[in-house]
Amino acid sequence: MLIVIFHKAIFSNSSLASSTLASSLLISFSSFLFISSVCLFTSSSFFADSVTCSFSTCSFSSTFGCFSSSFLSLSCLMSTLSALISCSACPRLSVFTVVVSASLGSVFTILTDS
C-alpha cells in the first residue's frame, strides 16, 4: 500500500522517465529490506551467515535487477525471487555458491531487459 502511494505521488509530480527510475529504486529498496529480513530470520548463525546472505546475495541480485528494469517488470520480480531463494538456502550454501546464484539472477535480468 505504501509503495502504491509513493508511486502515485512520484507520477503526479515529475516526468515519466524520472518517475519510472524512482519507482524502480523504491521497489529495489523495499525488496532489499524484505529479503534482508528473511535472510536474518532464516540463517542459523546470526553474525556469519546472515551478513553474508544479506550483503552478497540480496543487495547484488535484487537491487541491481530492479534498478536496471522498469517498475514491476517480470525481470525485477524474477530477480527478487532468485535472491529470495538464494537467501533462504544461504546457511546451507558456501559463499561461492551464493555469489554464483546472485550473478545468474542478474544475468537473467539483463537478458530479459534487452
UniProtKB/Swiss-Prot annotation:
Keywords, alphabetical: Membrane, Transmembrane, Transmembrane helix
Membrane-spanning parts: 21-41, 65-85, 93-113
Domain of life: Eukaryota
Keyword Glycoprotein: no
Statement: the UniProt record of this protein carries the keyword Transmembrane: yes
Topology in the lipid bilayer: Multi-pass membrane protein
Signal peptide annotation: none
Cellular compartment(s): Membrane
SS bonds (residue pairs): none
An example Gene Ontology CC term for this record: membrane
Additional free-text comment from the UniProt record: Almost completely overlaps SMI1.
Protein name: Putative uncharacterized protein YGR228W
